Curated annotation (Swiss-Prot):
Main location group: cytoplasm
Positions of Mg(2+) binding: 81
InterPro entries: PTS_IIA_lac/cel, PTS_IIA_lac/cel_sf
Cofactor note: Binds 1 Mg(2+) ion per trimer.
GO biological process, one term: phosphoenolpyruvate-dependent sugar phosphotransferase system
Source organism of this protein record: Lactococcus lactis subsp. lactis (Streptococcus lactis)
Biological role stated in the UniProt entry: The phosphoenolpyruvate-dependent sugar phosphotransferase system (sugar PTS), a major carbohydrate active transport system, catalyzes the phosphorylation of incoming sugar substrates concomitantly with their translocation across the cell membrane. The enzyme II LacEF PTS system is involved in lactose transport.
Compartments in which it is found: Cytoplasm
Keywords, ordered alphabetically: Cytoplasm, Magnesium, Metal-binding, Phosphoprotein, Phosphotransferase system, Plasmid, Sugar transport, Transferase, Transport
Stated name of the protein: PTS system lactose-specific EIIA component
Amino acid sequence: MNREEMTLLGFEIVAYAGDARSKLLEALKAAENGDFAKADSLVVEAGSCIAEAHSSQTGMLAREASGEELPYSVTMMHGQDHLMTTILLKDVIHHLIELYKRGAK
């Protein structure tokens, strides 16, 4: 994997994580408005985006674990940051939606 490929992989992770983040924030807004079916659906969609980002990341990690030297890329680090914070956001949003559901009862 050369530097350009690593940079493109970083952008791919940023894109998937960004899509997931947008869906999660939209899910929270839906829950605030009492539309729990939409909120749950958006969380599932976000999970699919996160899975795609994670798959891209896992491929890179497997290559490094097999001994391949991988070039450093600030874009990849940015992608890793986005993915990590989006995974955390998904956990927090899940709990917030559950609280909204309890409050609606």
